[in-house]
């Protein structure tokens, strides 16, 4: 990240910082500096409060300038499908290209969001690990409730497979086979599969939009 002093970006409405990532002063300094450089960071399990913060940040950056790229950095083991789909839909909704960068781990919903970045602008650091599998969830209640939940799980599974096939260029039959169990990829394997477009080792290999003037 550039050492040039970046202005503090106003944070609208509720606190957009991810919980549990240091005290308020640390969060203010780091996350506002990242936002000023059009960087959004997903560094935890995907759940509702995290998704709300990331969606708000994407909308904020789109409103500020709909022509400049947004960079979503991902180090996540996955999480809630509904929370992840809120982020996914917002990525597609904003006018900006959303570039994605994986570091550490992009598993499950983290993998899904990684491959959903703008075509040609999906990156992985060399030692990141990517894992794809089918969505899972508990089923309980009456027989009728179980039938409804099972139907919804099948719908979610098919929908996500179709989206992954779209973003990777893989046949959906291949996605069905490969996501039936946990499948792990190195960064280079993820590139070959179509999850990412580039494996990079240095920050200068990821184009930067720079701070807001």
UniProtKB/Swiss-Prot annotation:
The keyword Disulfide bond does not apply. It comes from the Bacteria. It is an enzyme of class 3 (hydrolase). It catalyses: Hydrolysis of proteins to small peptides in the presence of ATP and magnesium. alpha-casein is the usual test substrate. In the absence of ATP, only oligopeptides shorter than five residues are hydrolyzed (such as succinyl-Leu-Tyr-|-NHMec, and Leu-Tyr-Leu-|-Tyr-Trp, in which cleavage of the -Tyr-|-Leu- and -Tyr-|-Trp bonds also occurs). Disulfide bonds: none annotated. Its EC number is 3.4.21.92. One of its GO terms (molecular function) is serine-type endopeptidase activity. Fourteen ClpP subunits assemble into 2 heptameric rings which stack back to back to give a disk-like structure with a central cavity, resembling the structure of eukaryotic proteasomes. Belongs to the peptidase S14 family. This is ATP-dependent Clp protease proteolytic subunit 1. It comes from Frankia casuarinae (strain DSM 45818 / CECT 9043 / HFP020203 / CcI3). The gene is clpP1.
């Amino acid at each position: 990240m550039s050492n040039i002093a970046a202005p503090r970006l106003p944070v609208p409405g509720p606190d957009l910082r991810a919980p549990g990532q240091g005290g308020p002063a640390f969060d203010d300094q780091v996350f506002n500096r990242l936002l000023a450089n059009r960087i959004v960071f997903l560094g935890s399990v995907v759940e509702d409060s995290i998704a709300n913060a990331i969606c708000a940040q994407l909308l904020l950056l789109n409103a500020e300038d709909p022509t400049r790229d947004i960079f979503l950095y991902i180090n996540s083991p996955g999480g809630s499908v509904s929370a992840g789909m809120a982020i996914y839909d917002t990525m597609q909704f904003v006018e900006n290209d959303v570039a994605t960068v994986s570091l550490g781990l992009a598993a499950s919903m983290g993998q899904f969001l990684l491959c959903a970045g703008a075509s040609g602008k999906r990156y992985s650091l060399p030692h990141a690990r990517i894992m794809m599998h089918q969505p899972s969830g508990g089923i309980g209640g009456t027989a009728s409730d179980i039938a409804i939940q099972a139907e919804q799980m099948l719908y979610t599974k098919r929908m996500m497979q179709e989206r992954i096939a779209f973003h990777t260029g893989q046949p959906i039959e291949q996605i069905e086979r490969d996501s039936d169990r946990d499948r792990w990829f190195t960064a280079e394997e993820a590139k070959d599969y179509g999850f990412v477009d580039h494996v990079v080792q240095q920050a200068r290999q990821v184009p930067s939009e720079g701070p807001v003037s």
